[in-house]
């Protein structure tokens, strides 16, 4: 019944198996990928008719993670998989980027690739398997897929490169890099790194590239045995058509490209296609040429003009040389109510960035195949239509926005302080207010500025730069800080972010074959110099984190209590903790280890909540002084309420140094008095005294007994007086039981 074909290879000590002919047999291409206990089904379907006139290749990649792959039922009301998660979007883009450039340029048939995770093994990288499976499925389909792609993941642990590291190993790795390519070229790189040198990054790419070559071999073997006839493709347009357009309109195109302003240049270029189509109207009616052929030939001429100017004259659209960076302007603190803000402008690309602090309750909950976890740092990239002067409605975040946001997240995440050093959750929102190339790298620069202005103790400022490439034969030019048109007509989009010491994120997309490691070496070094120049400009505005947080930032502190007291703070049905939150206006987060984090909008609210928690969780010591309230007056003494919910008795002899006739002559119900704990009776009731209590230092925050885990407190990060210009010190609070500081703007 089944004509199953299987190919396998031992890869990094595990068997990688590709098979076809058993599942999804009606799809143009279908491959089951197995490694360990991970199983993926990857399919490719090609539309029978071309979709001409759309101006782009209609390729859609969908990566899906099925809940049953880990033996789970999806949450939510409908109990089924729904909208793609950010993780699924990111892996879909990861598959798309190395594959898209490898189709015949004239191929415009709608093509759908679906990669479904059917069984999940945390010891295997399913994103890598998805790229391999998608490439294999396309190689079996009729699509004119010109070369076969494979991929690998590279980690760096204890100075050694590790192929396809497990999730557990990645936690200790200095590098998380995905590289994809063909048998002779790298096509795509995506990475997050902990301040690695350019040489290390290049070596990691080489290591990954060499590692996936055996995988390409078995995909080729599978394709040879099971492939279907490929669609026959013609040239995108006749060479004679291009020559005729060039003869008639090249001067006008060159004049338009000579305009430095993006808007004016685009306006002039947009007028040309209509003139060209009008000239060839009779040929279109006679079906000698199609609109799509004419527009494609025109685009090719535009590309030739731009590329020749760069390669032959070392001159770019805006007049810069290949290494020049556009003019940079930085501004901080322009949004008074935000916790931190910055405006970063580089030429005609601009990003408005804000930083907001939250509590651990504001952390993003992520439900993935690995299980549920919380993300403390969130970065949202927004690309509104007005940034490129388009009249379009605002929509939900696109795949591009999710991808650009994640790249910026990778660039910033390695330099953030840990939760002990900085207990807040952090959200950064970067809105691209103008765009003419490299908006994701403007996001990185703006985010670094906004975080420093907000007072986040980052390890070092971070900047990002987008590099381009124009290559004809053996001649090539690497471009620093590319424009939108240079990205569109160029051969590479190479984004590098990092500090002055090393790289934190790298993303590379190559549109052509033949980009070797020599070109990549030149690009990395040129990017390093550009990054240092941008950092120099940023440092003129702010070079280190402010020493104080915004006055709008929440105050926070963390205390450690006995685990047995957690239930008392929560109360039946959460009654007690709700009452504390409602009366104080604070937020409280309790961990299983007895850590209690309290967040409030100001110092007073924080203190109210903290006092209430201590009243429940902390036992007073003999000799401690408290403010107490007289609850009931008797002939023999008075009952006093102190430390929230605790009661004690003051005997008449302990009320005053002088003899008194009656208790009521000195104390009345509701009176506020200072009392000292002097012991406990045989029933465990507290014995208090008022005598001389007001002469001692009072405390409503007693030091807990040793049997309460010493109730150690870790205060919110203290900021020194900015006028003293003292540096951040993560250990500055170790000698303090409690430190709650008001936050003020840094001037």
Curated annotation (Swiss-Prot):
<feature type="domain" description="S1 motif">
    <location>
        <begin position="623"/>
        <end position="691"/>
    </location>
</feature>
<dbReference type="GO" id="GO:0005829">
    <property type="term" value="C:cytosol"/>
</dbReference>
<feature type="domain" description="KH">
    <location>
        <begin position="554"/>
        <end position="613"/>
    </location>
</feature>
<comment type="function">
    <text>Involved in mRNA degradation. Catalyzes the phosphorolysis of single-stranded polyribonucleotides processively in the 3'- to 5'-direction.</text>
</comment>
<keyword id="KW-0694">RNA-binding</keyword>
<feature type="binding site">
    <location>
        <position position="493"/>
    </location>
    <ligand>
        <name>Mg(2+)</name>
    </ligand>
</feature>
<keyword id="KW-0963">Cytoplasm</keyword>
<dbReference type="Pfam" id="PF03726">
    <property type="entry name" value="PNPase"/>
</dbReference>
<keyword id="KW-0808">Transferase</keyword>
<dbReference type="GO" id="GO:0000287">
    <property type="term" value="F:magnesium ion binding"/>
</dbReference>
<dbReference type="InterPro" id="IPR027408">
    <property type="entry name" value="PNPase/RNase_PH_dom_sf"/>
</dbReference>
<dbReference type="GO" id="GO:0006402">
    <property type="term" value="P:mRNA catabolic process"/>
</dbReference>
<dbReference type="InterPro" id="IPR015847">
    <property type="entry name" value="ExoRNase_PH_dom2"/>
</dbReference>
<comment type="similarity">
    <text>Belongs to the polyribonucleotide nucleotidyltransferase family.</text>
</comment>
<dbReference type="InterPro" id="IPR001247">
    <property type="entry name" value="ExoRNase_PH_dom1"/>
</dbReference>
<dbReference type="InterPro" id="IPR015848">
    <property type="entry name" value="PNPase_PH_RNA-bd_bac/org-type"/>
</dbReference>
<dbReference type="Pfam" id="PF00013">
    <property type="entry name" value="KH_1"/>
</dbReference>
<keyword id="KW-0548">Nucleotidyltransferase</keyword>
<keyword id="KW-0479">Metal-binding</keyword>
<dbReference type="GO" id="GO:0004654">
    <property type="term" value="F:polyribonucleotide nucleotidyltransferase activity"/>
</dbReference>
<protein>
    <recommendedName>
        <fullName>Polyribonucleotide nucleotidyltransferase</fullName>
        <ecNumber>2.7.7.8</ecNumber>
    </recommendedName>
</protein>
<dbReference type="Pfam" id="PF03725">
    <property type="entry name" value="RNase_PH_C"/>
</dbReference>
<dbReference type="GO" id="GO:0000175">
    <property type="term" value="F:3'-5'-RNA exonuclease activity"/>
</dbReference>
<feature type="region of interest" description="Disordered">
    <location>
        <begin position="691"/>
        <end position="747"/>
    </location>
</feature>
<keyword id="KW-0460">Magnesium</keyword>
<dbReference type="InterPro" id="IPR012162">
    <property type="entry name" value="PNPase"/>
</dbReference>
<feature type="binding site">
    <location>
        <position position="487"/>
    </location>
    <ligand>
        <name>Mg(2+)</name>
    </ligand>
</feature>
<dbReference type="InterPro" id="IPR012340">
    <property type="entry name" value="NA-bd_OB-fold"/>
</dbReference>
<dbReference type="InterPro" id="IPR004088">
    <property type="entry name" value="KH_dom_type_1"/>
</dbReference>
<dbReference type="GO" id="GO:0003723">
    <property type="term" value="F:RNA binding"/>
</dbReference>
<dbReference type="Pfam" id="PF01138">
    <property type="entry name" value="RNase_PH"/>
</dbReference>
<dbReference type="GO" id="GO:0006396">
    <property type="term" value="P:RNA processing"/>
</dbReference>
<dbReference type="InterPro" id="IPR020568">
    <property type="entry name" value="Ribosomal_Su5_D2-typ_SF"/>
</dbReference>
<dbReference type="Pfam" id="PF00575">
    <property type="entry name" value="S1"/>
</dbReference>
<feature type="compositionally biased region" description="Low complexity">
    <location>
        <begin position="699"/>
        <end position="712"/>
    </location>
</feature>
<dbReference type="InterPro" id="IPR036612">
    <property type="entry name" value="KH_dom_type_1_sf"/>
</dbReference>
<feature type="compositionally biased region" description="Basic and acidic residues">
    <location>
        <begin position="727"/>
        <end position="747"/>
    </location>
</feature>
<dbReference type="InterPro" id="IPR036456">
    <property type="entry name" value="PNPase_PH_RNA-bd_sf"/>
</dbReference>
<dbReference type="InterPro" id="IPR036345">
    <property type="entry name" value="ExoRNase_PH_dom2_sf"/>
</dbReference>
<dbReference type="InterPro" id="IPR003029">
    <property type="entry name" value="S1_domain"/>
</dbReference>
<dbReference type="InterPro" id="IPR004087">
    <property type="entry name" value="KH_dom"/>
</dbReference>
């Amino acid at each position: 019944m089944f004509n199953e074909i299987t190919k396998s290879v031992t890869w990094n000590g595990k068997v990688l198996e590709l098979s076809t002919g058993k599942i999804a047999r009606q799809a143009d291409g279908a491959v089951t990928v197995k490694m360990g206990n991970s199983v993926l089904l990857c399919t490719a379907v090609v539309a029978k008719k071309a979709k001409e006139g759309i101006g782009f290749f209609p390729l859609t990649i969908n990566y899906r993670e099925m809940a049953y792959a880990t033996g789970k039922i999806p949450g939510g009301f409908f109990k089924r998989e729904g909208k793609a998660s950010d993780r699924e979007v990111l892996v879909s883009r990861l598959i798309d980027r190395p594959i898209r450039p490898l189709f015949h340029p004239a191929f415009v048939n709608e093509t759908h690739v679906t990669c479904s995770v059917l069984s999940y093994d945390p010891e295997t990288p399913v994103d890598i398997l998805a790229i391999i499976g998608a490439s294999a499925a396309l190689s079996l389909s009729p699509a004119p897929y010109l070369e076969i792609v494979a991929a690998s993941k590279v980690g760096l642990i204890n100075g050694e490169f590790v192929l396809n590291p497990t999730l557990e190993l990645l936690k200790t790795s200095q590098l998380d890099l995905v590289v994809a390519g063909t048998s002779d070229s790298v096509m795509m790189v995506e990475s997050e790194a902990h301040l690695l040198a350019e040489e290390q990054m290049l070596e990691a790419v080489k290591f990954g590239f060499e590692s996936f070559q055996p995988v390409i071999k078995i995909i080729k073997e599978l394709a040879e045995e099971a492939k279907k006839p490929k669609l026959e493709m013609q040239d995108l347009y006749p060479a004679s058509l291009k020559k005729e357009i060039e003869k008639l309109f090249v001067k006008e195109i060159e004049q338009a490209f000579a305009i430095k302003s993006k808007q004016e240049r685009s306006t002039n270029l947009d007028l040309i296609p209509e003139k060209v189509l009008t000239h060839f109207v009779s040929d279109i009616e006679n079906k000698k040429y199609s609109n799509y052929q004419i527009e494609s030939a025109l685009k090719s001429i535009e590309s030739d003009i731009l590329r020749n100017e760069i390669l032959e004259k070392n001159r770019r659209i805006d007049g810069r040389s290949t290494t020049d960076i556009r003019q940079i302007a930085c501004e901080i603190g322009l949004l008074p109510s935000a916790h931190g803000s910055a405006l970063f402008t580089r030429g005609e690309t601009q990003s408005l960035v804000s930083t907001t602090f939250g509590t651990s309750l504001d952390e993003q909950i992520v439900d993935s195949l690995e299980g549920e976890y919380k993300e403390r740092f969130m970065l949202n990239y927004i690309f509104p239509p007005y940034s490129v002067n388009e009249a379009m409605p605002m929509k939900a975040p696109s795949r591009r926005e999710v991808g650009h946001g994640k790249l910026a997240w990778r660039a910033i995440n390695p330099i953030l302080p840990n939760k002990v050093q900085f207990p807040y959750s952090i959200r950064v929102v970067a809105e691209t207010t103008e765009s003419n190339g490299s908006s994701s790298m403007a996001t990185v620069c703006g985010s670094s500025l906004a975080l420093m202005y907000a007072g986040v103790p980052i390890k070092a400022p971070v900047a990002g730069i987008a590099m381009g490439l124009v290559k004809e034969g053996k001649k090539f030019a690497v471009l620093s800080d590319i424009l939108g048109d240079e990205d569109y007509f160029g051969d590479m989009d190479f984004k590098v972010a990092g500090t002055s010491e090393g790289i934190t994120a790298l993303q590379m997309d190559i549109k052509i074959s033949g980009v070797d490691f020599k070109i990549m070496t030149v690009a990395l070094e040129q990017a390093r110099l550009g990054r240092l120049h941008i950092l120099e400009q940023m440092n003129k505005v702010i070079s280190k984190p402010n020493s104080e947080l915004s006055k709008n930032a929440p105050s926070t502190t963390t205390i450690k209590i006995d685990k047995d007291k957690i239930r008392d703070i929560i109360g039946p049905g959460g009654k007690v903790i709700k009452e504390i939150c409602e009366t104080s206006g604070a937020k409280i987060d309790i961990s299983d280890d007895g850590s209690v984090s309290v967040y409030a909008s100001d110092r007073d609210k924080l203190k109210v909540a903290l006092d209430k928690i201590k009243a429940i969780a902390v036992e007073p010591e003999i000799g401690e002084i408290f403010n107490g309230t007289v609850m009931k007056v008797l002939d023999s003494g008075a009952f006093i309420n102190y430390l929230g919910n605790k009661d004690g008795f003051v005997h008449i002899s302990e009320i005053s140094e002088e003899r008194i006739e009656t208790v009521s002559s000195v104390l009345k119900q509701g009176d506020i008095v200072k009392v000292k704990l002097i012991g406990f009776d045989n029933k465990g009731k507290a014995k208090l005294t008022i005598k001389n209590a007001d002469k001692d230092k009072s405390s409503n925050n007693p030091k807990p007994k040793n049997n309460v885990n010493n109730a150690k407190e870790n205060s919110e990060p203290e900021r020194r007086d900015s006028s003293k210009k003292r540096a951040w010190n993560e250990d500055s609070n170790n000698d303090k039981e409690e430190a709650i500081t008001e936050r003020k703007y840094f001037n």
